[in-house]
């Protein structure tokens, strides 16, 4: 009698990156990574908007000036202006050209500054979504994007645009990514010294996680795409900061910067309890790596967005198992 075996399930190639913080070059690399790595699914794990807006002031003589990273820039030609705006975009900042009167009025109105920032952030995110739809059209690659703790809810609303084929919102959802595996996504984080828009207590984060996991049929086939990494996992190691100074300063003892695990206890507890297939994390830029908590492979690719470098992790999944994984950089 011939022997029969179950046909092997097709592997799913997943590419994950995070914390691009508005960087035009880094996000474009992320979208192109799908084809480059022959991925079926690409996931952007949060902190997608930039950190500041740079006014470019049009002077009476037709020249421009701007202050970037503490240095005043004097621009005389359109070519120089294009080069400056490109550099600002690579750094993850936004820019807006304005005359002296508009600049003075803006400087005197904090609410107007906030409104301008949100408008610029949403416009860039919308342009990214259009770019992704164009680049991924016809490839079969699915792109999932979630926010992080730095991302304002009103800006993230752009992700909920209907009618998209390749780019799909996944925040606070459990989604089927390939017919074999699901992904649960959360972008909030525990408190930071910077009082970012989407911070919650560790206890609140734990409640959010458990409410989401209740929707998961089989955690062993689920990816936990949680922006905050598990505490004391080597994926969350960073300098300890003094929150009483402005800006927060590194704590030094015996001439050495004090390092600690800044991740979430609730994220770690959820992974230990539910033992998902895979944990995808970010938030702590300087702590890239891959480790295991029980059976669960956990990864944080890290981030050097301001240099235009895309760090990622490429994972091959099949039939509820992680077949292979590799950190990438480019």
Q: Model-flagged regions — what are they?
A:
Residues 2, 26-178:
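Core catalytic region of metal-dependent phosphoesterases/phosphodiesterases
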Residues 2-4, 22, 174-180, 196, ...:
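Binuclear metal-dependent phosphoesterase catalytic core
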Residues 11-21, 180-192, 223-227, 297-303, ...:
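Active-site-proximal beta-strand elements of phosphoester/diester hydrolases
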Residues 19, 27, 42, 47, ...:
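Divalent metal-coordination and catalytic microenvironments
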Residues 21-25, 49-53, 145-157, 176, ...:
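Active-site environment of divalent metal-dependent phosphoester hydrolases
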Residues 111-123, 225-275:
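Active-site-proximal segments of metal-dependent phosphoesterases and phosphodiesterases across multiple
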Residues 142-144, 168, 182, 221-223, ...:
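Proline-centered loop/turn at the N-terminus of a beta-strand
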Residues 179-223, 242-243, 260-263:
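Binuclear metal-dependent hydrolase catalytic cores centered on His/Asp/Glu-rich metal-binding motifs
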């Amino acid at each position: 009698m011939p022997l029969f075996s179950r046909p092997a399930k097709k592997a799913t190639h997943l590419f994950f990156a995070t914390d691009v913080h508005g960087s035009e070059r880094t996000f474009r690399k992320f979208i192109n990574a799908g084809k480059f790595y022959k991925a079926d699914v690409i996931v952007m794990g949060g902190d997608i908007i930039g950190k500041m807006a740079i006014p470019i002031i049009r002077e009476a003589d037709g020249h421009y000036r701007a202050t970037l990273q503490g240095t005043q820039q004097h621009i005389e030609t359109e070519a120089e202006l294009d080069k400056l705006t490109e550099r600002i975009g690579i750094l993850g900042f936004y820019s807006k050209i304005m005359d002296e009167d508009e600049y003075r009025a803006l400087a005197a109105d904090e609410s107007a500054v906030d409104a301008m920032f949100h408008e610029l952030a949403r416009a860039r995110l919308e342009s990214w979504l259009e770019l992704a739809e164009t680049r991924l059209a016809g490839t079969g690659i699915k792109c999932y994007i979630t926010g992080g703790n730095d991302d304002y809810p009103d800006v993230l609303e752009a992700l909920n645009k209907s009618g998209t084929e390749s780019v799909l919102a996944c925040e606070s959802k459990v989604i089927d990514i390939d017919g074999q595996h699901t992904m649960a996504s959360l972008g909030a984080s525990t408190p930071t010294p910077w009082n970012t828009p989407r911070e919650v207590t560790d206890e609140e984060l734990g409640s959010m996680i458990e409410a989401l996991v209740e929707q998961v049929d089989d955690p062993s086939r689920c990816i936990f795409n949680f922006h905050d990494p598990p505490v004391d996992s080597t994926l969350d190691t960073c300098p300890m900061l003094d929150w009483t100074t402005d800006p927060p300063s590194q704590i030094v003892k015996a001439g050495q910067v004090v390092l600690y695990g800044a991740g979430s206890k609730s994220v770690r507890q959820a992974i230990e309890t539910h033992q998902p297939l895979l944990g995808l994390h970010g938030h702590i830029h300087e702590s890239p790596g891959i480790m295991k908590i029980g059976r669960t492979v956990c990864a944080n690719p890290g981030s050097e967005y301001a240099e235009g470098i895309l760090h990622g992790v490429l994972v091959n999944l099949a039939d509820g198992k992680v077949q292979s994984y590799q950190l990438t950089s480019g």
